[in-house]
Swiss-Prot record:
The entry's keywords: ATP-binding, Chaperone, Metal-binding, Nucleotide-binding, Zinc
UniProt-listed HAMAP family: ClpX
SMART domains per the UniProt record, alphabetical: AAA, ClpB_D2-small, zf-C4_ClpX
Taxonomic placement: Bacteria, Pseudomonadati, Pseudomonadota, Betaproteobacteria, Burkholderiales
Keyword Acyltransferase attributed: no
Assembly, per entry: Component of the ClpX-ClpP complex. Forms a hexameric ring that, in the presence of ATP, binds to fourteen ClpP subunits assembled into a disk-like structure with a central cavity, resembling the structure of eukaryotic proteasomes.
Gene from which this protein is expressed: clpX
Gene Ontology BP annotations: cell division; proteolysis involved in protein catabolic process
Highest taxon, organism lineage: Bacteria
Name used for this protein in its record: ATP-dependent Clp protease ATP-binding subunit ClpX
């Protein structure tokens, strides 16, 4: 029985499992002719948790988490070159999600989160690396532009808007959002203007770094429900950012000079490197990036400390850009070939044209990002006229089309048949 009368005649309720009265426990929950206390509920939760962790141990350390080598191979399918950065990213992301899998386990060692800083020129693949990782792991992903952020209370985007976008990208599933990836681009553009802490208000520089710091190290972010604006007397969705992986990226123009100056100071005397400054490219110099260089550049020490994994990406050369045009799963040439195929035509880009495209992108200093605009410009007239043409078999792009704006060569079906017969 779960009900008894006390000596004073008062009706007492007892837990059906441990037998404690309603006065001995904090809470007694009633069911059909049974009662259970809060202490027994906690005990049941512990038993279920222990059973779940033992099942996980039997099944092995991971179920569907790719190893660093597998992650690196997946990145190879979409991103050309940048092998050192791929290895660093693969290990960091693997360790991060391995850490999340073991969060519920009781252990003396608490695994800290390692966020990532990607340093590399425009168009070197920073954003693509982060996007590919998120897609591979099937986790919510958002790209934020650091230049649009301001401190709370000023005109511009609040840093918590980043978490709001992440939540929107996973249909407001809080649990999924708390294990997502946030990529913050142009992080170098919010550097403070001098080495010394600012005495005036810097709402889009050091102030934003301070606001981002709380988000990156882990805080409870208050997000308006369903994308509304913040206003008083409103219920907020609480998101814990502790387990969100933050990847920050930037070109860091001028960082190579800071590194060179540090290297020259430390390399005086017989131990000095005889390699002249001209012999090393900016990309090679930036491979030696140290935390002190980033602080001198304008990132606050606390933020540098929260981004312990630094991966440097090299500037892409002509050979790498040609590979990007041809080799990845979603290579640009494959994309434009597919577009022309829908109109019944084949696309042929001659080797000299590929070299011309790569050289033009290098001259513009836009890296891989500039390849699409060059190809788009070369094929614009063809894509405009082709839907009205009935008989085009092949579109040929040569060096003259890229360098001098000459019209692409159109080969018609009759010509193709004649050349085939010969």
């Amino acid at each position: 029985m779960s009900e008894k009368k006390s000596s004073s005649g008062e009706k007492l309720l007892y837990c059906s499992f441990c037998g404690k009265s309603q006065h001995e426990v904090k809470k007694l929950i009633a069911g059909p002719s049974v009662f259970i206390c809060d202490e027994c509920i906690d005990l049941c939760n512990d038993i279920i948790r222990d059973e779940a962790s033992s099942v996980e141990t039997v099944a092995g350390p991971r179920t569907d988490l790719p190893t660093p080598q597998e992650l690196c191979e997946l990145l190879d399918q979409y991103v050309i070159g940048q092998n050192p950065a791929k290895r660093i990213l693969s290990v960091a992301v693997y360790n991060h999600y391995k850490r999340l899998k073991h969060l519920g386990k009781k252990d003396d060692v608490e695994l800290a989160k390692s966020n990532i800083l990607l340093v590399g020129p425009t168009g070197s693949g920073k954003t693509l690396l982060a996007q590919t990782l998120a897609r591979t792991l099937d986790v919510p992903f958002v790209i934020a532009d650091a230049t649009t952020l301001t401190e709370a209370g000023y005109v511009g985007e609040d840093v918590e808007n980043i978490i709001q976008k992440l939540l929107q990208n996973c249909n407001y599933e809080v649990e999924r959002a708390q294990k997502g990836i946030v990529y913050i681009d142009e992080i170098d553009k919010i550097s403070r203007k001098s080495d010394n802490p600012s005495i005036t208000r810097d709402v889009s520089g050091e102030g934003v770094q301070q606001a981002l710091l709380k988000l990156i190290e882990g805080t409870m972010a208050s997000v308006p429900p369903q994308g509304g604006r913040k206003h008083p007397n409103q219920d907020f969705v609480q998101i814990d950012t502790t387990n969100i992986m933050f990847i920050c990226g930037g070109a860091f123009d001028g960082l190579a000079k800071i590194i060179s100056e540090r290297s020259e100071k430390s390399g005086i005397g017989f131990s000095a490197s005889v390699k002249s400054r001209e012999e090393r490219t900016a990309s090679q110099v930036m491979m030696d990036t140290e935390p002190e260089d980033l602080i001198k550049f304008g990132l606050i020490p606390e933020l540098v400390g929260r981004l312990p994994v630094v991966a440097t990406l090299r500037e892409l050369d002509e050979e790498a850009l040609i590979q990007i045009l041809l080799e990845p799963k979603n290579a640009l040439i494959k994309q434009y070939s597919k577009l022309l195929q829908m109109e019944g035509a084949e696309l042929e880009i001659r080797p000299a044209a590929l070299q011309a495209i790569a050289k033009k992108a290098i001259a513009r200093k836009t890296g891989a990002r500039g390849l699409r605009s060059i190809l788009e410009h070369a094929l614009l007239d063809v894509m405009f006229e082709l839907p009205n043409e009935q008989n085009v078999a092949k579109v040929v792009i040569d060096e003259g089309t890229i360098n001098h704006g000459a019209k692409p060569l159109l080969i018609y079906h009759e010509q193709a048949k004649v050349s085939g017969a010969k």
